[in-house]
């Protein structure tokens, strides 16, 4: 338990139906008692937790009523932080909330830092670090599938997997260290070393299995950046509007209408996809259009995937080939548009000979080909993987790097065992693997890492 009491506004700024001041710490009830005047509940602080009390927030210095409020009490350890927690629920205006917060701080609370309530939940053992990070992922989830991935981590799915791996690794370590400390009693036969190496190989395979879903998990968490590119007037903005199901971008018959990158997020088969509608790629003397073309090149460089749109009505031109060359090296989907105007205008096999990626046919204005396009994008990311209630996916780059590091240490430890190297070498690698896995769940995380993680939270969480 930490020794001071913290407070902050726990609801978003601005006007709303309800605004909440959250107080957590050993003096939460004492401080709230100086601010809150209940109606008909004289001993509310001595009552049971998980109850709400009606009354008024007042300034104890002047006796002035600040707001009409409901106060909820959650007693330690059955609270979010495992400390005494009081929440003052008032009206959601900026002024009353700030006045109540100032009074609470004047009565002895300290203003909470970013994520400090969740940090206390971690330090007090209610959450591990994976679950603490998942709290932020739940808040930021943009699709139902993204939410399910975050909730799976919040429920402890990944933590259980990592915990089981660490426990198995600790057992291997204990056996090897016993043979080092007591060589006359615990001399490890070669067959046993092979068995221990097999256990390390199984744990290494567990790391690989989790890492196989890392790219899909990252997309669920951070979104997939898809740059829509092509020469002018091939239907890029029409495609953006069709995928958004709204007229977001201006569409005309005049080439070069789009001068800048337009970014919008859409839900494609559960994936949050950031669509980047770009300026048409062509040689031009127009200064503004040239700036737009430069930004298009930057968008392609920064995108996770490139969607090249071709115009069947104009055939496959040199400009199209230059666009395809620009997208080389990126995950790529080619969409041959306007097949309603020229069904045989572009031979898809000729395009397939130029690119490494799916080539689809579409008539965007008529809505043809959109379902196949969405399925293709999702398929490239998920690779047939189905997410559900019990899916465990690595969605955090920090977790991914730690797992990769743990896998390398496990491989080195296994190699040390089977090659006859001193057992102390294997012990060093096993301990390093344990530290890498512990960084994920927080057992071995240092203050610098915690500061970096919780700095991304809002102050009231």
Curated annotation (Swiss-Prot):
Its main location: cytoplasm. It holds the Pfam family MnmE_helical. Its EC number is 3.6.-.-. GO terms for molecular function: GTP binding; GTPase activity; metal ion binding. Signal peptide: none annotated. It is found in: Cytoplasm. Its cofactor is K(+). K(+) binds at residues 233, 252, 254, 257. GTP binds at residues 233-238, 252-258, 277-280. Coiled coil: none annotated. One of its GO terms (cellular component) is cytosol. GO terms for biological process: tRNA methylation; tRNA wobble uridine modification. InterPro entries: G_TrmE, GTP-bd, GTP-bd_TrmE_N, GTPase_MnmE, MnmE_dom2, MnmE_helical, P-loop_NTPase, Small_GTP-bd. It is an enzyme of class 3 (hydrolase). Residues 223-382 form the TrmE-type G domain. Binds 1 potassium ion per subunit. CDD domains: trmE, TrmE_N. Gene3D superfamilies: P-loop containing nucleotide triphosphate hydrolases (3.40.50.300), Probable tRNA modification gtpase trme, domain 1 (3.30.1360.120), tRNA modification GTPase MnmE domain 2 (1.20.120.430). (6S)-5-formyl-5,6,7,8-tetrahydrofolate binds at residues 22, 87, 126, 461. Mg(2+) binds at residues 237, 258. Belongs to the TRAFAC class TrmE-Era-EngA-EngB-Septin-like GTPase superfamily. TrmE GTPase family. HAMAP family: GTPase_MnmE. Homodimer. Heterotetramer of two MnmE and two MnmG subunits. This is tRNA modification GTPase MnmE. It comes from Desulforudis audaxviator (strain MP104C).
